[in-house]
Amino acid sequence: MVPDYAARVVAEDRLGEVRVIGGADASSTRFDPDRAVHAALVALSWPGLDRLGQAGAVKRGGLPYIPGLLGFREVPALLDAWEALAPRPGLVLVDGHGLAHPRGLGIASLLGVVLDVPTIGVAKSILVGEVEGPLGEAAGAQAPLVWQGRQIGVAIRLRRGANPVFVSVGHRVSLPTALGWVARTGRGYRLPEPTRLAHLAAAEVRRGADGGAG
C-alpha cells in the first residue's frame, strides 16, 4: 500500500498560477481509545494571505498509531475538511513531512497524491536525516537536510532566534519551489502563515470536539 502511493509522488513543478494558498494541520493522541483525529484546512488569498475560508473535521475510529504511517491515520480527517473547504487552494502547505520520511511518504505527500493537489511539507521536527552545516540565527537562514547521502529537505529559520522548520517536497512541487513558497509566506512567526493558521484552526476543532474544554 505505501509503495504504491510513494511511487505516485511527483517531485517536480506541476502547479499552475496560485491565487489561493492553503494550510493543513491534523493532530491525534497516541493512546486515545477513540482514535480521534482533529483536522483543519484554511484557504488564504495570495499574495495578501487574507483568510478566505476555513473548514475542520473530526474523525474517530481510524487506524491505530503505527510509527511511520501517521499520514494514513490523519489524512482521512483532512479529506473531510477538504470537502467542506471553499475556495479550494491551488497549493497546500501541510504541517508535517513530505519526502523527508523513512518511507518517502509523509502526510504532505500522501495528502497531495490522494487529492492530486500540489503540497509542501512543513515540519517542526526532524523525522529522519540531519541538518548539514551551520544554520545561522537570522531569519531566512537555511541548511540542507540530508539522509543516506541525499538531500531530502531544507531547514529554514523564518524568525530570528526561533527554531527552524523543515521543508520537503509534498507532491507536484520541486524542493526549490517548496522552499521559496515557505520563505515567502513567513510573517514573523516560527511557522509560515498557512500552517500557523491551520494549526490554530485545528486547535479550535479540538476544543469544539471536547465541548469547549481547554
Language-model regions, residue ranges each:
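C-terminal binding/interaction regions
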Residues: 1-9, 75, 80, 133-214
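Short beta-strand segments
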Residues: 24, 94-95, 121-123
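Two-metal-ion RNase H-like nuclease active-site motif
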Residues: 19-30
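A glycine-rich, hydrophobic loop/mini-helix early in the fold
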Residues: 31-88
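Catalytic-site beta-strand/loop segments enriched in glycine and acidic/polar residues
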Residues: 78-111, 115-117
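Flexible, glycine/proline-enriched loop segments at strand-loop-helix junctions
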Residues: 64-69, 94-102, 162-169
